[in-house]
């Protein structure tokens, strides 16, 4: 996802991911890959549509240069 300053936060799950290297959607789950490691965070949503909506929010935030995305 580039070198922009970017953060993904899930207050419900206590997750913070600085500059995620890659994010993908698999069904009802979002997979957030951490930079410089083989670690990943998996967030599960109630529906695929909800997961898609959050994925789109993250993509739009990244493209617009926003700093934080709250999940």
What do these predicted regions represent?
Residues 1-71:
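Eukaryotic intrinsically disordered, low-complexity regulatory linkers and tails enriched in Ser/Thr/Pro
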């Amino acid at each position: 996802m580039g070198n922009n300053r970017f953060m993904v936060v899930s207050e419900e799950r206590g997750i913070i991911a600085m500059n995620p290297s890659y994010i993908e959607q698999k069904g009802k789950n979002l997979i957030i890959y951490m930079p410089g490691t083989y670690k990943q965070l998996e967030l599960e949503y109630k529906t695929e549509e909800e997961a898609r909506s959050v994925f789109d929010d993250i993509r739009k935030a990244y493209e617009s240069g926003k700093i934080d995305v709250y999940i």
